[in-house]
């Protein structure tokens, strides 16, 4: 475990322990993962490296580790990570996967990036994602698609596909992601890794390029629940001066309750998550996971989330509406792409946005502008907000009967790249099980629980009540202590 050939098979917790014991250096570790990431560039997971910055951070971590004599160093000191390119970073490009921001370099770091850096994380680079985090297949990036390491002809999921693929391929031990309607959980499921979206407001959105401001949330992606707990502890905390939606709650140690028994835990199983449209292979893997949780002492409770089907139209009204507002700032005036030739200011706006945005982003801007327009606001946007409240109420009714909700992450395993053709509805329908929790602002996570057709990974989704991340991580950790699915590795990596 102390040789460079095995470094990429270590979890964050294992690697951090070796670094603190000085059995491996941060510099050696950074060089090893940089070499792996660059050697597997065809995966499409990375968008940018800055080797000078990465190695400088690693050397600084080694000096801090050498100077420590009382064990007071940050837990993650020297651990390498990369960030989804939706977080702005001072020393790396910040493109949001869009031609609109091609080559853009931010003058500051996102709060999540700063918090992880304060805990000693070494930044390896920036990771590919769907343009402005809009997509379920990571095919919408202006810089090319990401490939699933389990089958290079298939999607890794989206929009945090680069993060999920890089972790699954052992190009790095962990990565940041963002989740608006399932963009951490779905790619985690498709790539066989563990990922968690915390309660809305747990992690600061400052420095996250905004898609839908009432839904966007940052979270970690790693191979184990223990690693996610370590990372989430570092990422969360109040940021009142820079993010008004940040919760005024102190940072929490999510590792503290990982090993608690789940004996007697009530796990709600929503009937609506197991109906028509759920593939048999996914159903079998999820059913197997639920039976394993029963063996660990949990009790399965049938519940209902009656407005599950409404989550798709509600989400695809609210999220595009917020996107149309947020993306109005990209007009070619102050930063980002600007059309080379134009007749006047209005023409410059039109050509800049036509050239800079991809098809899916344009589609959502148009939908959002339409539902916010005079005469349609009440009929669409206001109505969607009312139903959103009802969806949140459905969850609160369910939690009167259970402690945690469990079900599939997606109706199918990862599909072929280009498999949905030019049918955006097919991508939208793939989010049906992740959207309800997102609309309610609840924490949710995905953990690998088996394989479906063509030996593609399947994830189990856990959804907790507000601020119950520790409970989700506890359930996931106990499951992973009893099973081996999270240890599976794609061939060739």
Swiss-Prot record:
Superkingdom, taxonomy of origin: Bacteria
Biological processes annotated in GO: translation
Catalytic activity: L-glutamyl-tRNA(Gln) + L-glutamine + ATP + H2O = L-glutaminyl-tRNA(Gln) + L-glutamate + ADP + phosphate + H(+)
Record-linked SUPFAM superfamilies: Amidase signature (AS) enzymes (SSF75304)
Protein keywords: ATP-binding, Ligase, Nucleotide-binding, Protein biosynthesis
EC number, as in UniProt: 6.3.5.7
InterPro entries named in the record: Amidase, Amidase_CS, Amidase_dom, AS_sf, GatA, LisH
A GO cellular component annotation in the UniProt record: glutamyl-tRNA(Gln) amidotransferase complex
The keyword Lipid metabolism belongs to this UniProt entry's keyword annotation: no
GO MF annotation terms: ATP binding; glutaminyl-tRNA synthase (glutamine-hydrolyzing) activity
Active site: 84, 159, 183
Subunit structure comment from the entry: Heterotrimer of A, B and C subunits.
NCBIfam families: gatA (TIGR00132)
Family in the record: Belongs to the amidase family. GatA subfamily.
Functional description taken from the UniProt entry: Allows the formation of correctly charged Gln-tRNA(Gln) through the transamidation of misacylated Glu-tRNA(Gln) in organisms which lack glutaminyl-tRNA synthetase. The reaction takes place in the presence of glutamine and ATP through an activated gamma-phospho-Glu-tRNA(Gln).
Protein name: Glutamyl-tRNA(Gln) amidotransferase subunit A
Species assigned in the record: Albidiferax ferrireducens (strain ATCC BAA-621 / DSM 15236 / T118) (Rhodoferax ferrireducens)
Gene: gatA
């Amino acid at each position: 475990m102390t040789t460079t050939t095995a470094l990429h098979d270590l979890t964050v917790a294992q690697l951090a322990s070796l670094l603190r014991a000085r059995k491996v250096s941060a510099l050696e570790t950074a060089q090893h993962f940089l070499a792996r990431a660059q050697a597997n560039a065809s995966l499409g997971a990375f968008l940018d490296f800055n080797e000078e910055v990465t190695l400088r951070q690693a050397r600084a971590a080694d000096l801090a580790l050498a100077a420590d004599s009382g064990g007071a160093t940050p837990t993650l000191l020297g651990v390498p990570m990369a960030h989804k390119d939706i977080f702005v970073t001072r020393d790396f490009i910040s493109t949001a996967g869009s031609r609109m921001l091609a080559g853009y370099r931010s003058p500051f770091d996102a709060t999540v990036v700063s918090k992880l850096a304060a805990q000693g994380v070494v930044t390896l680079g920036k990771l590919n994602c769907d343009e402005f985090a809009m997509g379920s297949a990571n095919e919408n990036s202006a810089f090319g698609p990401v490939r699933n390491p389990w089958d290079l002809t298939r999607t890794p999921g989206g929009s945090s596909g680069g993060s999920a693929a890089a972790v699954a391929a052992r190009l790095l031990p962990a990565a940041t992601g963002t989740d608006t309607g399932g963009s951490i959980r779905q790619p985690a499921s498709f790539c066989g890794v563990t990922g968690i979206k915390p309660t809305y407001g747990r992690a600061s959105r400052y420095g996250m390029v905004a898609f839908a401001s009432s839904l966007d949330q940052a979270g970690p992606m790693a191979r184990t629940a223990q690693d996610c707990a370590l990372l989430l502890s570092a990422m969360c905390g109040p940021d009142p001066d820079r993010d008004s939606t940040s919760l005024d709650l102190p940072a929490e140690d999510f590792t503290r309750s990982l090993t608690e028994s789940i004996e007697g835990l009530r796990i709600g199983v929503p009937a609506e998550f197991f109906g028509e449209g759920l593939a048999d292979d996914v159903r079998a893997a999820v059913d197997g996971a639920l039976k394993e949780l029963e063996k660990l002492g949990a009790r399965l409770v049938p519940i209902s989330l009656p407005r599950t089907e409404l989550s798709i139209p509600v989400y695809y009204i609210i999220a595009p509406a917020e996107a149309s507002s947020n993306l109005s700032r990209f007009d070619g005036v102050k930063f980002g792409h600007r059309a080379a030739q134009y007749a006047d200011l209005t023409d410059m706006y039109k050509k800049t946005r036509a050239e800079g945005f991809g098809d899916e982003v344009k589609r959502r801007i148009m939908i959002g502008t339409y539902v916010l327009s005079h005469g349609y606001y009440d009929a669409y946007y206001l109505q969607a907000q009312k139903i959103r409240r009802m969806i949140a109420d459905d969850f609160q009714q369910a939690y009167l009967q259970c402690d945690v909700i469990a079900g599939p992450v997606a109706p199918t395993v990862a599909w072929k790249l280009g498999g949905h053709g030019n049918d955006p509805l097919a991508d939208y329908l793939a989010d049906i099980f992740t959207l309800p929790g997102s609309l309610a602002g609840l924490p949710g996570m995905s953990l690998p629980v088996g394989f479906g057709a063509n030996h593609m990974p399947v994830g189990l989704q856990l959804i907790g009540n507000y601020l119950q991340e520790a409970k989700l991580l506890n359930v996931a950790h106990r499951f992973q202590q009893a099973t081996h699915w999270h240890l599976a590795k794609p061939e060739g990596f």
